Amino acid sequence: MKFIKGFDKLSNYCKILVFLSLFLVLILIFKTPKREGYEQLEKYVMKKGDDIYDELYSDIYDLLVYNDLKNDYEITKIVDKTGVGNDSVFLDVGSGTGHHVKLLSDKGLKVTGIDKSSAMVKKAHTNFPDCKFVTGDVLNTDVFNNGSFTHITCMYFSIYYLHDRHQFFNNCMEWLKPGGFLIVHLVNPDKFDPILPPGNPLQIVSAQKYAKERITTTKITFNEFVYTSNFNLNKQNNTATFEEKFKFNNGKIRKQEQLLHMDSLEVIANEAKDAGFVLRNKINLVGCAYVFQYLYIFSRE
């Protein structure tokens, strides 16, 4: 009762601050990720490249990067800007745990997801058993027949993990039907926010806006371990390393290092044009709070 009486005496401004504080506490409580079922046997593990995408990473991946509002925004914009019909057939490159495939499928569209990681494909099948996922390398021209798709999507940094983008763009040109669309997620390497979503509970407000220097680290406390990551951009050779560390409660440690080929927006767009694509549109993802990130829409003539 004393609290209620005291609260009633507060100004409207102070009441708003109290509610915001309680709201932030609730966000932090409910957004603390939970994961079960994995036990690392070795005291120390170091993984690089494709080896990273194993059972643990496929299990934890959604907790680190999944954002349903962003995914909905992207798919809605893609459908609106490219147009779809009964004859539309989608391929989602780097489909991961399957969420973009599921959203497209829910719209009644034919869609296949492809990923190099068998663990990620297995997780996608578990998440969405009615959707189609295959394990394969998109740098292999023979993985699909010519003219198989009307749309190819390459979402959430997938383009940056490819060591031969020229081959990828040439393959997409072959796999697309005439008039088909290639949609690629691209970022401004110098300005996008590398903090993972759980590391920024509010999400709608970027910490970068108020930081004197770019924040490149993320730290998240899980039930079983503490997760940290850091994004290191090398402007000299247009690459970046994404370093991750899992420190388990039992003292065991797992480290990971991923290499990204982080050329500028213009360079990658020109590579697509060199393969014969025409840039038709750009979707700015600031509309879903992903600043300096875009969907470039190319078409095959």
Go through each PLM region and give its residues:
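Conserved class I S-adenosyl-L-methionine
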Residues: Y13-I16, L20-G85, D87-G96, H99
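Class I SAM-dependent methyltransferase SAM/SAH-binding core
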Residues: G98-N140
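A short acidic, Gly/Pro-enriched loop at the edge of an enzyme's catalytic core
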Residues: V143-I152
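Residues lining the SAM
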Residues: T153-F157
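A short glycine-rich, Lys/Arg-flanked "PGG" loop and its adjoining helix->strand segment in the class I
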Residues: H166-F181
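SAM-dependent methyltransferase
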Residues: V184-V267
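C-terminal lobe and adjacent flexible extensions of AdoMet/dcAdoMet transferase-like proteins
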Residues: L259-E301
